[in-house]
């Protein structure tokens, strides 16, 4: 049978989602816990591979198993065998047409900036700290140039392995909640480092170092070297993955938990 899980994790201390030799990863920990509960080797497929230090509140995975277990085993049982910074949030049996990555129609990320003169002690790995005076409205206005299907070469990592730089950004919003500035962006898919590279350039606009038209200019240049530095990983969360209604997967609050939704 094929099982889908909703996963939440704190990416700090992991070398990203993907299983790698000799380093710890979220995938390796999840597969270990699932294999214990299933009493057989389990391999998982995810909706989106997050980088080192990046978090998720809405990651979705699927796996195949011959084990017959109830919902409590796949949630409470797996959680009992996971580190405290990884948690299963929901489980659902799905048909064989479902694939966590290839069935997804959209992914959504939130990047959380703590905009204050002094760095935080609490949540220091859950937010990215920037001390300058950030104009969130200015960032939001500039970000609208990203909408639609476009060539995002200027915002892809040099090591990105995607065959095409084109992605379709469905929506992007930048808002302020007190000392937090949140960049909320959804697209059909994302290039390697695309969200963090976009945030890095939006910050330059928000800090008044670049004009409102800069995002559009960067898209036209198709040159990663012309854009700003990549934003830090700690503020980034994969918060939602969209699938066709036929699969009827559970939907939870987007998170992260300390934000007002």
Swiss-Prot record:
Keyword Mitochondrion attributed: no
GO terms under biological process: tRNA pseudouridine synthesis
Active site per UniProt: 51
CDD domains according to UniProt: PseudoU_synth_EcTruA
MF (Gene Ontology): RNA binding; tRNA pseudouridine(38-40) synthase activity
Main enzyme class: isomerase
Domain of life according to the entry: Bacteria
Similarity comment: Belongs to the tRNA pseudouridine synthase TruA family.
Protein name: tRNA pseudouridine synthase A
Organism from which the protein derives: Shewanella baltica (strain OS195)
Protein encoded by which gene: truA
